[in-house]
Amino acid sequence: MSQTRTITVEKQTLAPAKEVANVTPGLIMEKTYGSFLNVNELAKATDWEKSTIKDLAEINKNIVRWRSIRAVKPYSAIATGYINIPEDGVYFISSNNEEVWIDGKLLINNAGETKRFSRHDTSIALAKGLHELKVVFLGNRLGGWPTYWNLCEIELRKSDNDKFVWVTPDMLFH
């Protein structure tokens, strides 16, 4: 028999957008080198490189997908900033990243999973405008799958739409 799936229905009010002055395009990314198997291990990291990225794909842009990753120096990254939600509504969110947070709420937690296909999609009611965003990427071989081969993207789908769309650079700010 197949695995039982539990679906929780929760009535939500729209999470209000943030009033932020002087935003610039992109996200702030902090990257640390080392082999980390879970988010808690990142607290031990002492050397972080800070940069600005225009797109979530830049988290692992220098990795040649579908090639050997033996030459890749292991690293993990945290990208923070804001996501601009185009209109009020309930949004379904999907990602193969380790974690995705919106407005300080952990929405996607792929801890302990092979990051090949997201199994922890979720939804949240969001008002139009800027919302805090945090994306955690753990670069490693987890469950036999190199996370470096994943696209470090987030997909959104408004509840009245049929298809997910990528979060695009014009939606990201810091």
Give the location of each predicted region:
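Edge beta-strands of extracellular beta-sandwich domains
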Residues: 2-7
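Extracellular/secretory pathway-exposed regions associated with glycan biology
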Residues: 8-90, 95-174
